[in-house]
Amino acid sequence: MPALSQPLSKSLLLAAIATVVGIAAASPALADDVVRLGNLKFAHYGAVSYIKEIAPKCGIKIEEHVFPKGLDVMQAIIAGELDVGAASSEAAISGRAGGAPIYVVAGFAKGGARLVARPDAGVKSVKDLKGKKVGVTRGGIHEVLLAAELAQNGLSYADTPGKDVQFIYLAFADLNQALLGKNLDAIMQSEPQSSQAINKGFGVEVIKPYDTPIGEPVRTMVMTEKFYKERRPLAEKFMRCFVEATRTFIDNKALAEKYVRDTIFKGQISKEDFNDAIGNSPYAYDVTPEHIQITTDIMVKYGIGKMAKPPIARDWVKTDLLEQAKKSLSGGH
């Protein structure tokens, strides 16, 4: 018996060593395929979230981190905690101006803003906001759109009393509650929250704020310069996965609705909320340097983001990965 156990132990030992070596060899490969993604919890950010569901078949693993607002995504990028992030164009522009080493590599939705008033506030147009309190989230595209709309209508504004319109800065998650509680007269809100306010009867649409030079604001996918330059094969895989997830949401509305309503919002939004939200913030892929430059110029004009050195869009909007991904997936949409 002892004679038999000797070779057996040796073979077990060799097998164990082989397994450990195998794991050690495999681990770096697995670690190499992880993409750290920053995201926000909105209906039109749903396709970005869906990337993690199809990531295994793309040959990657997504670590999704959800933040309250886009500027938080930029802070995490500066801290070296993310490879890619989803944010409004304004947050990306402020981030780049503030030293975030990022490129805009795609758009993923457009629109996603609505000026909503209390039904009893007597606000039928932007001009009616004179003397009112308007809630908005600081550092989102919504603040830029609100400033542009007020300026177009000859109204002054500040976050203290004394101007035509008083801004009250609140998190996106708190705006509806403040409107419902009649602490505000109107809010510039995202989706699906603005649709919810209207469908639940405590808000009425004043305008969708797309008549400024910005038009419908594009939400941006940003990538760190390091990831774009040094992790090219993984960046290419990620972009193909992004295009595939987005295309799936555009083509299969039922799947998109189920995922956003059940997985992201855990049944807190209705079918009507989802349909109205996506009607006002459709999924997309594209972004242009021109759009980012106009948005930058408007931010500078109204002093939003307070950038010492506004970035030049053509230096940091890089859509080559997107175009390549769209081509490789049968030509895109």
Where are these regions (language model features)?
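Short, solvent-exposed loop/beta-turn-alpha elements that line the ligand-binding surface or hinge
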Residues: 57-59, 211-213, 281-288
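Short, glycine-/small- and polar/acidic-enriched structural segments
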Residues: 32-169, 181, 185-191, 202-208, ...
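Bacterial N-terminal signal peptides that target proteins for export
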Residues: 1-16
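Conserved C-terminal helix/tail region of periplasmic/extracytoplasmic solute-binding proteins
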Residues: 300-333
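Sec/Tat signal peptide C-region and signal peptidase I cleavage site
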Residues: 23-31
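Pocket-lining segment of extracytoplasmic ligand-binding domains
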Residues: 89-91, 161-164, 168, 173-262
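Secondary-structure end/capping motifs
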Residues: 229-308
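Extracytoplasmic/secreted envelope proteins and their assembly/folding machinery
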Residues: 45-52, 74, 89-92, 126, ...
